[in-house]
Amino acid sequence: MTFEQAKKRSLVLKEQLEKWNYEYYVNDNPSVSDQEYDRALQELIAIEQQYSELITIDSPTQRVSGQISEKFNKYVHTSPMLSLGNAFNYDDLIHFDEQIKEFTALPEIEYTCELKIDGLSISLVYDNHVLVMGATRGDGLTGEDVTINIKQIKSIPLRIDQPTLIVRGEVYLSVEEFNKINEERVKNGEFKFANPRNAAAGTLRQLDSTIVAKRKLNAFLYYYVNALQDGIQSQYEALQRLEQLKFKINPEYRYCSNIAAVWAYIQEYEPKRNQLGYEIDGIVIKVNNLNLYNRIGYTAKNPKWAIAYKFPAEVVVTKLLNIFPSVGRTGRITYNAVLEPIRIVGTIVRAATLHNADFITERDIRIGDNVQVKKAGDIIPEVINYVAARRQKNAQKWQEATHCPECNSLLERVEGEVDQYCINSVCPKKITRGLEHYCSRNAMNIEGISEKIIERLFKLEYLKSFSDLYQLEQYRAEIIELENFGEKSFENMITSINNSKNNSLERLLFALGIRHVGQKTAKLLARQFKTIDNLAAMNIEQLSIINDIGPIVAASVVDYFAIPANQQELALLRQNGVKMEYFATNQHLAQKFENYRFVITGVLSKSREYFKELIESYGGQVSESVSAKTTYLLAGTDAGNKLVKAQKLNVKIINEEEFQQLLSKED
């Protein structure tokens, strides 16, 4: 075959394969057999192997990949991917509708309703007709570039009949595919995924794209960014345009002329939620008229023109077979229920939380009882109570544990708390749970070291403390011989461990697992004290006077640094090169708004979350409410009550232009 013949044939094959992809993965109506599709794909692969210059990034062959990524690059979204506020009942919806009417001064509001897919949010960028970027939501401002994995999703077009587009949607797994994946994982001796959402999220973040290709991820697209600029006037019209561009759109969307029609839609789909073949956790309600969005505005985290109606948690009844305690990284004891398997919201549940000993004894829940179970937020199954009318005479009275289930140490209760604690500092489970937390994404962000790997390395006595992570190189020969490990996996793990040495102080403080110190508090402490030595030198009184640090947190921090074992561990971390100071990309800028407290209100050119991140990066704090301690109120249009309160308190009020002047002002 000559080059010209190959070129013509490859164009025909590309067009044909994309058409078949669309029929199969979007319309669910294939016109050819799998064998015919595979023959055409193999023919195109052969042509491109012969003439590599014919390979284009939108070729169907580029979906088939054996690429393994070292890590995913960060991607800054052109506009924030905001979360949605929630409604839980009819009254919440009426309140939402009344607010929209107040913002717009309209007597009736038209809406578009869509099913809320329980998956992982993504953003797709097309340039010159071709998919050039696929990114996860991340924190809403910055996500991860997972383009190579997005290309494995056959329902997502690689080329569209429009020069440019940014479109957002949800990656999900069907219940059928989820069950197949879990069956395969059980055969391979791996842990099962808890639910389809976790499976989809874990798959999309796989570094090995061949694994992604094997799992049949799917995607519904629903948000056309910059639709107004392209002449589209409504959300309903935007969805129709996305359909025309051959994106997979959830077919259940509907135009609703008013809030009563919205409620009717919700009532229709709530009983259908388990019959769809994929999981949903509510209904998304959006103002249909896109021209109203800027007038209605945004909060710091959510658009005011949309809301998510969350279905009430499904409650089922099943038999309680057993109760057993487990211990977490802080030593806190959680009681768990072993259940007769029952289906809740599309998944089989065999276990649920019973929280703490007081929860069980106050309700007199017994082994053998029929119990009510729900999934809290449709994620964590929990026992609510027992069914008194169905209690058997032989139901076994439960006794709370007195000793740790892992190390057999005597359990203790902390004054003022309902929980029991294992206080043994060398409890194996506390150590491994603590290591898992230390390595987690929001802490030191060490990749390639899972819960299973930590437990294996702990049993081999290679890993017993945080500082041991930085000495694993000495066990290279032994570790690469472990099952499911190897040279490449080891190198990736060591690289990530070494990278963690350069984290800023707030990550380390959160990773250490200091009681009551979450991400927000860790960031506040890091910015305030700059080094771990400065923080360790503080007493309870000095810490308590800091904004948002109360006496409980202060006491916990002081107690942590007073323990000799913790002092020794910090010294070892320092010896291994772990940085223990706070730093930003520019230290001078990071102090610009030091001791300044901002409140943000009204409609601005960007989301409140954008301005919050910006202020915090310059060392400032952002509060939700105006007080005498507020330094500046950053006010956009439609500022409302916060503006009135700021005026009464003589708080300095600035607009966006004045805020930019503050940023650029020389110190």
Curated annotation (Swiss-Prot):
Active site: 116 (n6-amp-lysine intermediate)
Binding positions (Zn(2+)): 404, 407, 422, 427
UniProt-recorded Gene Ontology molecular function terms: DNA binding; DNA ligase (NAD+) activity; metal ion binding
GO BP term, pick one: DNA repair
GO cellular component term of the entry, any: cytosol
Family matches, as InterPro entries: BRCT_dom, BRCT_dom_sf, DisA/LigA_HHH, DNA_ligase, DNAligase_adenylation, DNAligase_N, Hlx-hairpin-Hlx_DNA-bd_motif, NA-bd_OB-fold
PROSITE patterns named among the record's database cross-references: BRCT
Catalytic activity from the UniProt record: NAD(+) + (deoxyribonucleotide)n-3'-hydroxyl + 5'-phospho-(deoxyribonucleotide)m = (deoxyribonucleotide)n+m + AMP + beta-nicotinamide D-nucleotide
Regions annotated as coiled coil: none
Record EC number: 6.5.1.2
Function: DNA ligase that catalyzes the formation of phosphodiester linkages between 5'-phosphoryl and 3'-hydroxyl groups in double-stranded DNA using NAD as a coenzyme and as the energy source for the reaction. It is essential for DNA replication and repair of damaged DNA.
Family assignment from sequence similarity: Belongs to the NAD-dependent DNA ligase family. LigA subfamily.
PANTHER family: CHROMOSOME TRANSMISSION FIDELITY FACTOR 18 (PTHR23389), DNA LIGASE (PTHR23389:SF9)
Protein name per the record: DNA ligase
Organism: Spiroplasma citri
Protein encoded by which gene: ligA
